[in-house]
Amino acid sequence: KVFFEERFEDGWENRWVKKD
């Protein structure tokens, strides 16, 4: 499952695509 995280405060690395 792939989803985008809208966490700009955490930084770009965390905002990139995360694979679950």
Curated annotation (Swiss-Prot):
<dbReference type="GO" id="GO:0046872">
    <property type="term" value="F:metal ion binding"/>
</dbReference>
<keyword id="KW-0256">Endoplasmic reticulum</keyword>
<keyword id="KW-0106">Calcium</keyword>
<dbReference type="GO" id="GO:0030246">
    <property type="term" value="F:carbohydrate binding"/>
</dbReference>
<dbReference type="GO" id="GO:0005788">
    <property type="term" value="C:endoplasmic reticulum lumen"/>
</dbReference>
<comment type="function">
    <text>Molecular calcium-binding chaperone promoting folding, oligomeric assembly and quality control in the ER via the calreticulin/calnexin cycle. This lectin may interact transiently with almost all of the monoglucosylated glycoproteins that are synthesized in the ER.</text>
</comment>
<comment type="similarity">
    <text>Belongs to the calreticulin family.</text>
</comment>
<keyword id="KW-0430">Lectin</keyword>
<protein>
    <recommendedName>
        <fullName>Calreticulin</fullName>
    </recommendedName>
</protein>
<keyword id="KW-0479">Metal-binding</keyword>
<keyword id="KW-0862">Zinc</keyword>
<keyword id="KW-0325">Glycoprotein</keyword>
<keyword id="KW-0143">Chaperone</keyword>
